[in-house]
Design a protein with these regions (language model features):
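Short, acidic/small-residue loops that bind anionic groups at enzyme active sites
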Residues: 66-82
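Short Gly/Thr/Asp-enriched flexible loops that form oxyanion-binding sites at enzyme active sites
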Residues: 35-38, 49-69
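Short helix-loop-beta junction
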Residues: 9-20
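Short beta->alpha junction loops
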Residues: 20-31
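Short, structured coil segments at secondary-structure junctions
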Residues: 17, 67, 89-92
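Short, glycine-/small-residue-rich phosphate/pyrophosphate-handling segment
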Residues: 5, 12, 80-129
């Protein structure tokens, strides 16, 4: 699970941009697939996805190809212990963020918010255009 401090930062960063963030820790492939489906029904604007051990899942690949919203692939790995990433070309992946441990989620959110046109972000990191 994400450290509480990171969760607070995610919520604050989204709030500063006038957005809300829904956090969901998925314990299985099916939970991840269900969360993506529900997000689509809720008209999610964008998602941060950490595929974890599901990077090779054919079911996840199919769902990502058909997502009605873009996503940022995010990993909480470190530079010296990189996790495997999803294959290229799965839906509308606007970026992959990895190597910054839990801070990767904050960087991913900053990228997502910039993609949505939220350029007045109050965070410490600017991901640039």
């Amino acid at each position: 699970p994400l450290p509480r401090a990171v969760i607070r930062q995610l919520v604050a960063c989204a709030g500063d941009a006038g957005k809300t963030v829904a956090l969901r820790a998925c314990g299985s492939e099916q939970e991840l697939l269900d969360a993506l489906r529900v997000a689509g029904q809720a008209r999610m604007e964008i998602a941060l996805i950490d595929p974890g051990s599901c990077v090779d899942s054919a079911r996840l690949h199919r769902v990502l190809r058909d997502l009605p919203y873009p996503y940022v692939e995010t990993h909480d790995d470190s530079v010296d212990r990189p996790e495997r990433c999803l294959p290229n070309g799965l839906g509308h992946c606007i970026a992959t963020v990895r190597g910054y441990c839990a801070q990767s989620y904050l960087l991913g959110l900053e990228i997502a918010l910039e993609h949505l046109g939220c350029t007045e972000i109050q965070g410490d990191v600017h991901v640039g255009t």
